[in-house]
Amino acid sequence: MTTTLSPDQVAGTTRVLIIEDEPIIALDLENLVSELGHKVVATASTRDEAVAKAKSERPGLVLADINLGEGGSGIDAVNEILASFDIPVIFITAYPEKLLTGERPEPTYLIAKPFLPETVQATVGQALFFHPVAKQAA
């Protein structure tokens, strides 16, 4: 069963899940997302933690690193999350070539590390604006 965004998630504050194993980068992303008026409902550093937090927090957007070190794959976490939720995903990674293998979830956005704050903020806006669920709710 796929869950869609609620109208308040589309129209205003979006609940955001950050999947990132580096605490400083996770905090930086949390600050950037908060500056846009969205709410970070959870931060996860492993695949299993990300999936569990997505199920409990029901985010409207996911920002995900690909390589979670010993914590598994961000791609695997996102694939499992997208099996239950129809939400936009932005991959933020130092390994963008891993998304060129054809194994990435669709549709996704990609930002290479190191990133500029303006790039993250613009991509969050695009992901929420252009997502099919957001268009239907408008």
PLM segments and residue spans:
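A Lys-centered signature of the CheY-like receiver
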Residues: 113
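Acidic, metal-coordinating helix/loop segments flanking the phosphotransfer/catalytic sites
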Residues: 30, 43-61
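Hydrophobic/aromatic residues positioned on beta-strands within the core alpha/beta folds
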Residues: 90-93
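Active-site residues of response regulator receiver
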Residues: 65-66
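Short amphipathic alpha-helix used as the core "switch/output" element in two-component signaling
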Residues: 75-87
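Acidic catalytic/metal-coordinating carboxylates
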Residues: 46, 72-76
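Two-component/phosphorelay signaling modules centered on CheY-like receiver
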Residues: 22-42
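Non-catalytic signal-transmission and effector/linker regions of two-component phosphorelay proteins
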Residues: 1-17, 24, 101, 116-138
